[in-house]
Each structure stands twice: as C-alpha cells, then as structure tokens.
C-alpha cells in the first residue's frame, strides 16, 4: 500500500492483545478508528477499539466481512495463520 489513509479511515487489526490496544489508542489520537479481529472473547484491545469481530481464524465468511468493514489491515502479532491472510489479501491491503 502506497497511499496514506485519510483520517477517519478504519484500520483493521488482526489480534486484540496489548499491542493491539496500544495501536488502537495511538491511531485514535491521529484520527483513525480501529476494528479488531480476534478469536478470543473480550480481547484487551476491544475496550478501546471502534469495533470488534470475534471469530475463528478459519472463518472465511467472518474474515471477508471484517475486510469489508475496514480500509487497511495490519497484524498485531506474528502468528496469524497464513490461511487467514490468504482470504484477506485479495480484499484489502494487508
């Protein structure tokens, strides 16, 4: 992705742990909203994010809906399954 996201854009974050929480807070200060995708109920980042999707990494339907709700996607941690990224990459910049 080479274009900058305009303020107000939604950043999708794969993983809702402490790093996702800190990223959400920093993004909000810059005028962005964050949407978390995490299989765990009530992830730490969920308290500060604009939206949360709770679904399995293998749920292609939930991943596609998540991609449709965000403008770009980033990873909170390095162990996101490659199959999940394979679903997301054709839909949004990762």
Segments (PLM) and residue ranges:
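ATP-binding N-terminal substructure of ATP-dependent carboxylate-amine bond-forming enzymes
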Residues: 1-94
């Amino acid at each position: 992705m080479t274009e900058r996201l305009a303020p107000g854009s939604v950043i999708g974050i794969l993983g809702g742990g402490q790093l996702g929480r800190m990223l959400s807070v920093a993004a909000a200060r810059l005028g962005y909203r964050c949407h978390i995708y995490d299989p765990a109920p009530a992830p730490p980042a969920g308290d500060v994010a604009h939206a949360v999707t709770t679904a399995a990494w293998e749920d292609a339907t939930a991943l596609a809906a998540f991609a449709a709700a965000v403008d770009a996607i980033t990873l909170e941690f390095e162990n996101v399954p490659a199959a999940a990224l394979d679903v997301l990459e054709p839909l949004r910049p990762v």
